[in-house]
């Protein structure tokens, strides 16, 4: 079975619910997507697109609350000695639980002004606590190599930005490298995006397919447990949907 035939079969046979998309998947031997699947309508440099800061949220308040609640359930307890977290594709807000702190929380994004304003990267007067301890400005589509040592992080998060990665396997292999054995990677997404900058395989498919696409990144990157999908949509049909695909680095990787 060729790659396009496999994709057509799997997309038509999985449940209509994203949470079921990664159950009992028979992955082909080779990564089933082609280079053109990762092209975008707008191929101008991403640095230009993200040059001006956008101090807006990209999902609604209910979806944000659902994501924050999920984080509160799966993150290591606040102030756990030695814990490090990386928020990839970060901006001016990370949606971590209020007051959440760790010894090292790194934000990586495209716009420095947004990262500087992140309440996890700035000590606001009197009422807000430091959350981000450092930030890195990097275009993962140009430079997927992550500037961190092996086995550095306990958790990696990515909020509604996995759909912009044009070299996802390179990035996910790097995620595996920098995660500690047993470390958790959480990719969250909705049906909202900058359409012109999202990859074509994303804009031409639906939520269930998206769970399968992200799951394939974990699978073909290697070194991860079988990925799982979770639907945390707070008010189906009334607010933004919210989905999680997550996996842990194998303890032997």
Named regions from a protein language model:
Residues 222-223, 231-253:
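Core SAM-dependent methyltransferase catalytic element
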Residues 142-150, 166, 177:
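Short conserved loop adjoining the S-adenosyl-L-methionine
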Residues 58-146:
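Class I SAM-dependent methyltransferase SAM/SAH-binding core
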């Amino acid at each position: 079975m060729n790659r396009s035939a496999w994709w057509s079969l799997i997309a038509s046979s999985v449940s209509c619910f994203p949470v079921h998309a990664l159950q009992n998947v028979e992955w082909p031997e080779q990564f089933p997507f082609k280079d053109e699947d990762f092209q975008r309508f707008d191929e101008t440099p991403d640095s230009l697109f993200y040059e001006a800061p956008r101090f807006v949220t990209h999902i609604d308040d209910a979806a944000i609350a659902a994501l924050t609640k999920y984080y509160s359930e799966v993150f290591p307890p606040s102030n756990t000695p030695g814990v490090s977290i990386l928020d990839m594709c970060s901006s001016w807000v990370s949606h971590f639980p209020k007051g959440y702190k760790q010894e090292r929380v790194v934000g990586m994004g495209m716009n420095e002004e947004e990262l500087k304003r992140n309440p996890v990267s700035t000590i606001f007067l009197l009422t807000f606590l430091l959350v981000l301890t450092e930030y890195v400005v990097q275009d993962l589509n140009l430079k997927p190599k992550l500037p961190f040592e092996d086995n550095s992080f306990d958790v990696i998060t990515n909020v509604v930005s996995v759909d912009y990665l044009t070299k996802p396997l390179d990035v996910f292999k790097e995620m595996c490298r920098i995660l500690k054995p047993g470390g958790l990677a959480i990719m969250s997404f909705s049906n909202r995006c900058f359409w012109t900058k999202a990859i074509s395989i994303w804009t031409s498919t639906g939520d269930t397919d998206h769970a399968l696409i992200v799951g394939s990144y974990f699978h073909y990157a290697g070194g991860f447990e079988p990925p799982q999908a979770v639907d945390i949509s707070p008010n189906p049909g009334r607010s933004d949907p919210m989905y999680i695909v997550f996996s842990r680095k194998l303890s032997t990787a």
